[in-house]
């Protein structure tokens, strides 16, 4: 007689995470974490497949998907891509059904960000793989070649640059703006840094040009205006003494611009036209004058110095007199000493310029201006994350009051001229 008793169906054993004792004892903690993590990932993927397809060996006519073996995939781990076995699921009509965990872990953004961060701290594309923590031997890793790292850096920074150069700046209440240029290969990158009412610094824009000329600077300022920068109220501009930059600011802001010439650049220009034996005494005299909060007294000291140099060193005397009043602008505004020191020079933006120079010196082959712009913007954005408030920021309300008074004088000018 035929036995019609059905055999009990096999039940799927729920996945469990376990390691043998020798593995725990012999592996270091770093390798152990990776090993356990990869096992947990495989079990999580299999659990998600079971939720979609139902338990193994149990027939369910109403199930929405079925198992379809596995294939070799890749995920991001520790700054590189690693090969991982990916379970596959198919719908009744043959379409691939994605597993949520795999979709989330297969994002490329973490890898792009890691490559960008490594390069911005000075790791070259050739040494990128050596900068990463080693993985256990049983994990197959790839994607750390210099060309792969370079492609990720370009991809990540290109998206950041496009967003950075188009973002609105009208919602940043500014009291001062600094402009300076840095040479990157055959290109000049003009950088604008603004200081808001709380003393925080903001990289507002970057412009690429062949030289630090008025046209390039004007285009940068016009771009900032189109992105929301107000040109209808007075603003303090701290410049290095470049006539091209000053002309461009005057073209865009007109009389609303108050100019502060950098005293460090002024001192450097004067000393370059003097013999070395005079550097110490002239530097001391200029520093003593600029350390005063009395603009009239400082101007008198500097004019006396120019007269003493006029006979033997007329070039140095002329350099000292040129734009002298604009090196004392912040002194005349009656600001506190700490804020005067912060705004009397372009040191605040020079630190950023130095970061750009340091990183650009590592690049051996500059392909074009777009590459130079991308590197400059990436460096500027990275440096901006570490910006601190300027010293003397509590005195900014006094600066804003002085700027408002300047606006009021400009508004009364037509009335005085008519009278």
Identify what each model region corresponds to.
Residues 1-24, 28, 42, 46-50, ...:
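Acidic/histidine-rich catalytic cores and adjacent linkers
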Residues 110-122:
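Short, amphipathic alpha-helical "recognition" segments used to contact nucleic acids or chromatin
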């Amino acid at each position: 007689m035929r036995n019609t008793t059905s055999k009990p169906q096999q039940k799927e054993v729920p996945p469990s995470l376990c390691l043998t004792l020798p593995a725990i004892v012999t592996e270091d903690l770093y390798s152990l974490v990776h090993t356990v993590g990869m096992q947990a990932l495989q079990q999580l993927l299999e659990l998600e497949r079971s939720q979609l397809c139902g338990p193994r060996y149990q027939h369910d006519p109403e199930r929405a998907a079925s198992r379809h073996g596995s294939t070799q995939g890749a995920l991001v781990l520790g700054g590189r891509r690693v090969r991982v076995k990916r379970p596959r699921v198919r719908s009744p009509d043959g379409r691939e059904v994605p597993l949520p965990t795999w979709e989330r872990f297969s994002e490329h953004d973490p890898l792009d960000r890691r490559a960008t961060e490594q390069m911005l701290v000075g790791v070259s594309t050739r040494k990128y793989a050596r900068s990463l923590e080693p993985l256990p031997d049983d994990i197959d890793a790839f994607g750390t070649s210099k060309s792969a790292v370079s492609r990720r850096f370009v991809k990540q920074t290109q998206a950041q640059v496009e967003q950075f150069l188009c973002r609105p700046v009208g919602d940043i209440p500014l009291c001062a703006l600094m402009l300076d240029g840095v040479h990157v290969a055959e290109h000049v990158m003009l950088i604008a840094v603004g200081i808001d009412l709380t003393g925080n610094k903001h990289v507002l824009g970057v412009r690429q040009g062949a030289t630090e000329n008025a046209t390039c600077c004007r285009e940068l300022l016009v771009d900032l205006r189109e992105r929301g920068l107000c040109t209808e109220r007075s603003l303090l501009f701290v410049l290095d003494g470049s006539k091209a930059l000053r002309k461009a600011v005057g073209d865009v802001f007109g009389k609303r611009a108050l100019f502060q010439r950098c005293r460090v650049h002024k001192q450097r220009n004067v000393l370059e036209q003097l013999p070395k034996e005079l550097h110490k005494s002239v530097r001391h005299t200029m520093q003593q004058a600029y350390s005063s909060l009395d603009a009239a007294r400082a101007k008198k000291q500097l004019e006396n110095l120019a007269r003493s140099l006029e006979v033997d060193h007329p070039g140095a005397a002329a350099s000292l007199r040129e734009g002298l009043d604009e090196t004392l602008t912040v002194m005349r505004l009656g600001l506190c000493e700490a804020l005067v020191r912060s705004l009397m020079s372009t040191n605040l933006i020079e630190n950023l310029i130095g970061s750009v120079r340091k990183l650009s010196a590592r690049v051996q082959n500059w392909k074009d201006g777009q590459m130079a712009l991308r590197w400059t913007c990436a460096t500027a954005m990275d440096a901006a994350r570490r910006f601190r408030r300027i010293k003397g920021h509590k005195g900014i309300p006094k600066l804003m009051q002085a700027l408002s008074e300047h606006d009021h004088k400009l508004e009364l000018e037509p009335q005085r001229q008519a009278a």
